[in-house]
UniProtKB/Swiss-Prot annotation:
This is Acetyl-coenzyme A carboxylase carboxyl transferase subunit alpha. GO terms for molecular function: acetyl-CoA carboxylase activity; ATP binding; carboxyl- or carbamoyltransferase activity. It comes from Salmonella paratyphi C (strain RKS4594). Its main location: cytoplasm. The keyword GTP-binding does not apply. Belongs to the AccA family. One of its GO terms (biological process) is malonyl-CoA biosynthetic process. Keywords: ATP-binding, Cytoplasm, Fatty acid biosynthesis, Fatty acid metabolism, Lipid biosynthesis, Lipid metabolism, Nucleotide-binding, Transferase. Residues 35-296 form the CoA carboxyltransferase C-terminal domain. One of its GO terms (cellular component) is acetyl-CoA carboxylase complex. It is an enzyme of class 2 (transferase). The keyword Lipid biosynthesis applies. HAMAP family: AcetylCoA_CT_alpha. It catalyses: N(6)-carboxybiotinyl-L-lysyl-[protein] + acetyl-CoA = N(6)-biotinyl-L-lysyl-[protein] + malonyl-CoA.
Length: 319
């Protein structure tokens, strides 16, 4: 299966190609006198070591590329791998069902929870149907409807953030995109149930923040969170998207920097090579973090939850 290697992973890709070639030869002719298995084993060890070396020194732009990786697990992948009995709920009860936002009730180790997240889509048709993970106002209104339902039934809310940003089309603006985002920020700060938010890929601007006001905010190791994309920032400051790598470094979009600024609580480690290399292991780590966060929040009163959440929101922008 192709891993869709990125530019900075080309040395790894070359090694993996050699491994695949030798493995294919071994399968085609099992009567070969030479022992190919030993060479394959040696190359695999070399590939792992090379991957460790490359990933130990990634820059912000390389992390941004990983956050957008076409094979990276999306919300529904984590729902399938970490939760049980997911029942999707649709529509904002006002205009439409925005497929860029998915949500519904599931069980986390037997406990009912409300899941809400961005969904990008993989194949061309699905990407178009889900608008590449860029929600319109009806998507955020659907998310708010599900949050209010969770509050009525005293269910914790778990959100997964993975979007380039809110959809900037004329229709979305006409239907109140900024109002929908602002309303979500206000209402999420008032919810009487625990809210846990995790950035699993791209955390793009207000489109991410509209489901990102939580009691706990986590990021996967190779995810990003920013007010604008590196390309967008570069186009504004240097009039050229080619300066995106420079912008990415300057913007502080990666998890360690955001944790240093106290904008997030936890960084969830990814498998070697990124979440797409081992979605099952990534889902297990994510699930463990969610269970730990829920245990921490269960001991807090409703007033404490709301006060802490509100103060977090109000602290954004202060050094």
């Amino acid at each position: 299966m192709s891993l869709n290697f990125l530019d900075f992973e080309q040395p790894i890709a070359e090694l993996e190609a050699k491994i695949d070639s030798l493995t294919a030869v071994s399968r085609q002719d099992e009567k070969l006198d030479i022992n190919i298995d030993e060479e394959v084993h040696r190359l695999r060890e070399k590939s792992v070591e090379l991957t460790r070396k490359i990933f130990a020194d990634l820059g912000a732009w390389q992390v941004a590329q990983l956050a957008r990786h076409p094979k990276r697990p999306y919300t529904l992948d984590y729902v399938r791998l970490a939760f049980d009995e997911f029942d999707e709920l649709a529509g904002d009860r006002a205009y439409a069902d925005d497929k860029a936002i998915v949500g519904g009730i599931a069980r986390l180790e037997g406990r009912p929870v409300m899941i809400i997240g961005h969904q990008k889509g993989r194949e061309t048709k699905e990407k178009i149907r889900r608008n590449f993970g860029m929600p319109a106002p009806e998507g955020y209104r659907k998310a708010l409807r599900l949050m209010e339902m969770a509050e009525r039934f005293n269910m914790p809310i778990i959100t997964f953030i993975d979007t380039p940003g809110a959809y900037p089309g004329v229709g979305a603006e006409e239907r109140g995109q900024s109002e929908a985002i602002a309303r979500n920020l206000r209402e999420m700060s008032r919810l009487n149930v625990p809210v846990i938010c995790t950035v699993i890929g791209e955390g793009g601007s207000g489109g991410a923040l509209a489901i990102g006001v939580g009691d706990k905010v986590n990021m996967l190791q190779y995810s990003t969170y920013s007010v604008i994309s590196p390309e967008g920032c570069a186009s504004i400051l240097w009039k050229s998207a080619d300066k995106a790598p420079l912008a990415a470094e300057a913007m502080g979009i990666i998890a360690p920097r955001l944790k240093e600024l106290k904008l997030i609580d936890s960084i969830i480690p990814e498998p070697l090579g990124g979440a797409h290399r081992n979605p099952e292991a990534m889902a297990a780590s994510l699930k463990a973090q969610l269970l730990e966060d829920l245990a921490d929040l269960d001991v807090l009163s409703t007033d404490d939850l709301k006060n802490r959440r509100y103060q977090r929101l109000m602290s954004y922008g202060y050094a």
